[in-house]
């Protein structure tokens, strides 16, 4: 008990004043129970403050920068956690699972960004879910991204690791096949797939018939641009843009067309295949404003 009291006073100088005001340290206490009660209340105050400060810090993302050993020593690893604690066991699991998915293709990758988050359950409405998002920055093949939700954080890490491994293997196989058939290759004789030309009416029809996103109750939702990103946009062929769209696992992809130099938008059609939006004669056509009902949806952005 004496050791605990000394430690508590050393950690929180305010406790010294509190004890001094209520206890005469130079004299023997006449009421032992009163002394014990005063000391307990003072120490409890200090402990409550410490716990509160830890809870506040957990609301901020924990960012850890690491690197693997051995063949992966050249690959930078960034691990972030939001609304959860990144324990040593979780960090070791990420290093093991994500590391194994990247190990055989480490020459293609320069940086791995892993983001772990929690929602639902005690944190918010809805079922308890754990999300793992992995973004790979490759040396010559753009960005590869995958994300998965699961009840267990470890399960979400395992699922994403498998997806990343498949995507890297696909890139490696393509590079190998490309090198194997490069002899006698003439790029000018290779035609990119002809894009499907769509009309304005077709675009509006797809937008209006698209399923509405799941809405949530959020009175504090602000309908404005809350984040802006800047990207390098090197010229790509349509085939290369399709590959990038699959790698980032998004529904659309904006790119600079290698042939025309214009910004095009490639997107997945709900009937299957891809659609391509191209400026008409190098100039965008201004569309009339249409009343669109805004559905509030959850955001997992930073």
From Swiss-Prot:
It is found in: Plastid, Chloroplast stroma. One of its GO terms (biological process) is negative regulation of translational elongation. Coiled coil: none annotated. The keyword RNA-binding applies. It holds the Pfam family Ribosom_S30AE_C. CDD domains: RaiA. Residues 1-66 form a transit peptide. One of its GO terms (molecular function) is rRNA binding. Ribosome-binding factor involved in light- and temperature-dependent control of protein synthesis. Interacts with 16S sRNA nucleotides at the A-site and P-site, where it protects the decoding center and inhibits translation by preventing tRNA binding. Stabilizes 70S ribosomes against dissociation. May be recycled by the combined action of ribosome-recycling factor (RRF) and EF-G. Binds to the mRNA channel of the chloroplast small ribosomal subunit and interacts with 16S sRNA nucleotides at the A-site and P-site. Belongs to the HPF/YfiA ribosome-associated protein family. Long plastid HPF subfamily. This is Ribosome-binding factor PSRP1, chloroplastic. It comes from Spinacia oleracea (Spinach). The gene is PSRP1.
